[in-house]
């Protein structure tokens, strides 16, 4: 009787797709309106000046400028966009 014993089925082998969270534009980098600066769950980073906060807590640029990360006395890190100085006309 040349039979093989039935192989057991594994209960593992599943994983969720990564969400690609984190900082997308770092301090000092140039951004234009609409650029995503941080993708996050909750507010690990808080919205500062010239940035918007999406419903999924994504921080994005509202103006052209450079990204600035600042830690305040309350311990929170605020992300802002420092506008570029307009050329004198």
Curated annotation (Swiss-Prot):
Keyword terms, alphabetized: Ribonucleoprotein, Ribosomal protein
PROSITE patterns linked to this entry: RIBOSOMAL_L27 (PS00831)
A GO MF term: structural constituent of ribosome
GO BP term (any one): translation
InterPro entries in the cross-refs: Ribosomal_bL27, Ribosomal_bL27_CS
Region (Disordered): 1-23
GO cellular component, one term: cytosolic large ribosomal subunit
SUPFAM superfamilies with a match to the protein in the record: Ribosomal L27 protein-like (SSF110324)
Classification via HAMAP family: Ribosomal_bL27
Family note: Belongs to the bacterial ribosomal protein bL27 family.
Descriptive protein name: Large ribosomal subunit protein bL27
Record organism: Rhizobium meliloti (strain 1021)
Gene assigned in the entry: rpmA
